């Protein structure tokens, strides 16, 4: 069952965000993840418009997604992430 991590974020420091993306991106790929979408252009089709940037990452299954999120390689990126942006990560399991 494919798993998607949806990261919603508000950038606090663009330089730190670039450094975070450079550090974190390879950890996703090393754990079998694939970037599906990254963007900040938002238009509400129904309901309230939320102005957040998003990144959507696909993993083969939820176990691999969780392994990536708790991996030492990604955990090392946490200080950069916290300086770069306010983030929320949500894991979705698809059928």
Predicted regions and their residues:
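C-terminal structural segments of small proteins and small subunits
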Residues: 62-90
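Short S/T/G/P-rich N-terminal loop/turn motif that feeds into the first structured element of a domain
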Residues: 1-70, 93-95
């Amino acid at each position: 069952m494919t798993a998607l991590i949806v990261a919603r974020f508000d950038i606090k420091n663009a330089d730190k965000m670039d450094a975070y993306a450079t550090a974190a991106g390879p950890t996703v790929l090393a754990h079998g993840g694939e970037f599906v979408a990254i963007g900040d252009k938002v238009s509400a089709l129904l309901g309230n418009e939320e102005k957040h940037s998003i990144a959507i990452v696909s993993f083969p299954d939820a176990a691999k997604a969780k392994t990536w999120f708790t991996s030492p390689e990604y955990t090392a990126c946490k200080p950069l992430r916290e300086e770069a942006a306010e983030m929320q990560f949500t894991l979705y399991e698809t059928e």
